Amino acid sequence: MEESSPKSLLDITLLYLSTHLEKFCWERQDGTYCLQDAAIFPQEVADRLLQAMAVQRQLNEVTVGIFRGNQLRLKRACIRKAKISAVAFRKAFCHHKLIELDATGVNADITITDIISGLSSSKWIRENLQCLVLNSLTLSLEDPYERCFSQLSGLRVLSITNVLFYNEDLADVASLPRLESLDISNTSVTDITALVACKDILKSLTMHHLKCLKMTTTQILEVIRELKKLNHLDMSDDKQFTSDIACRLLEQNDILLHLVSLDISGRKHVTDKAVEAFIRHRPQMQFVGLLATEAGYSEFLSGEGCVKVSGEANQTQIAEALRRYSERSFFVREALFHLFSLTHVMDKANPEMLKLVVIGMRNHPTNLPVQLAASACVFNLTKQDLAAGMPVKLLADVTHLLLEAMKHFPNHQQLQKNCLLSLCSDRILQDVPFNRFDAAKLVMQWLCNHEDQNMQRMAVAIISILAAKLSTEQTAQLGAELFIVRQLLQIVRQKTSQNMVDTTLKFTLSALWNLTDESPTTCRHFIENQGLELFMKVLETFPSESSIQQKVLGLLNNIAEVKELHTELMCKDFIDQISKLLHSVEVEVSYFAAGIIAHLVSRGEETWTLSSSMRETLLEQLHSAILSWPTPECEMVAYRSFNPFFPLLACFRTPGVQLWAVWAMQHVCSKNPVRYCSMLIEEGGLVRLHRIRDHMCADPDVLRITITILDNLDRHLKKHGNPPCQKPPFTK
């Protein structure tokens, strides 16, 4: 499937061009754009550029100017959701030799009569335009207005749904000499008798949800009987009416004998027996729409055979429904509701189904019932190991839409819960590209407004992972939001008072650890909100929980790195607590305790406000503790950069401080050389290590580890060459 393949070079180029037009254009006197390069684009490329601009919502008065001349020759034009005037439309598009135009949902400044008037100004378009889509537009701002559809004599396909389109307009359309396909869904038509005028040419008729229709069932059937060429008929509805039209139609054996496709989804009184009999009288039939009816449950109508079925009885029918009804919110919701029921237990990933859910979500971003059902389906389709079988690009699309749903419905608890359940996936959080900064903010906002314990655990788990993936700048920006630190500290306070060690506490500590990393503002928020006192309480409450101690000390390391907060840590009780943990048998605990001491001691005697004898004792203990550490079997810590270590490397008067810094560097460079050797070289670590190697008074233990690091760096350079400029992501 396409989601598992990289984008084509053309797609990447057109996406960039469509979103950075200002770099490739000059401005005319009227402010519109004109491409700088005079090269002529191939017609297919021009069509795709226009479509890319439409998808990216980049079509406006200024940007459509690039289509005025002959550099970009259009044939199939998509201007969906464009924000343009009638004048801009005429200048940009009406000189092209168009055979198709999709103007769905263009802004209210341009009407259907404006569009047809512009198109009709070209003799070529009048005679050759074949397909015109004018859904969700205003017909005219004038009353009365001149009906003008008949001017487009070459038109074969017309879609004019969700429009105040009346019987007289239908009569005008029915006079088109080549009209083969017509969609008048959700219009104001009350009488379809005018369609008899095109009975000998009309092959496809879609009239979904004709809510204003005032004809009797018999009268409707009489018109349909006349449409002898019809091979597609859509009479579906949103279950709002009790009309017996579907039931009566299925009883007719002598009409629609050439029918290939019939859609009666949402209609009443439909049975499997009647549908099956209707199809058997028309063996050429290929599709029947039965969603939101009582039919579709027989083996004959399963959708697995020659006849495709949109329905709710099985996943095949539901997939067909999602494909065909992606722009009909009611049917999308119905299909998703039944999909959720059928996907509680899945043993195999289904990317095709997830793609259909994505399309439904994207087409109806502000429809709560759709988003609610879709987010629930996303969870079923991606939970546990199922996400591993999904293409990354597809998961990226899903994640973006989940975040959009959270933004649109911030106060709907069930929808927020659905989205969090789906986001709480290692595959998504670790491997999928999406805006992690926005996601972290959204989840934090949810966390601050809800107290559901199960959801709280998920939220802090998500935040702890997201925070580790952010850049230093993003982490600082996120941590600068005071409410975030305050809320996380409140969770820690609650768990500590309950004497409870659980995953929520661990994830919350990890989140705070990651948020304070190389972020002085967040560290200050931590101190100002009594974080230090709280964390000392945590250490006292859980004296035998090494995993808790490690996270607490890791965060306190981040605080100790901030020079401006040095005095906040110059507290005897605090130093005594850290000194005890320096002697922990757990190397991970001792390591972080040593880091705190190293940073505090490194700033010199003049900044040490406690007793000098304590400082000397700590330095001795620091040195001996480091030398006692066994080599860890795995990487026990991760760093964004080595910048916090560099000041420590210059502390020749306190070799214990240097020793901790080089031990840390050696540890990560030996466990993950590709990442950390490159980082150390890139950040200028070689020069600093050379200074230690060449210093006459370098401590032997420090010198030994320094030489080991330099040897590792030398091997790395020989194997990989100079490191790239881009840094790898950070995780903790």
Swiss-Prot record:
Report the Pfam families cross-referenced here.
Answer: ZER1-like_2nd
GO CC terms: Cul2-RING ubiquitin ligase complex
Q: Which UniProt keywords apply?
A: Leucine-rich repeat, Repeat, Ubl conjugation pathway
Q: Which domain of life is it from?
A: Eukaryota
Database matches in SUPFAM superfamilies: ARM repeat, RNI-like
* Mapped LRR repeat ranges: 128-149, 154-177, 178-199, 209-231
Q: Which residues cross the membrane?
A: none
Q: Which family does it belong to?
A: Belongs to the zyg-11 family.
User: What does the UniProt record say this protein does?
Assistant: Serves as substrate adapter subunit in an E3 ubiquitin ligase complex zyg11-cul2-elongin BC. Targets substrates bearing N-terminal glycine degrons for proteasomal degradation.
- State the name under which the record lists this protein: Protein zyg-11 homolog
- UniProt source species: Xenopus laevis (African clawed frog)
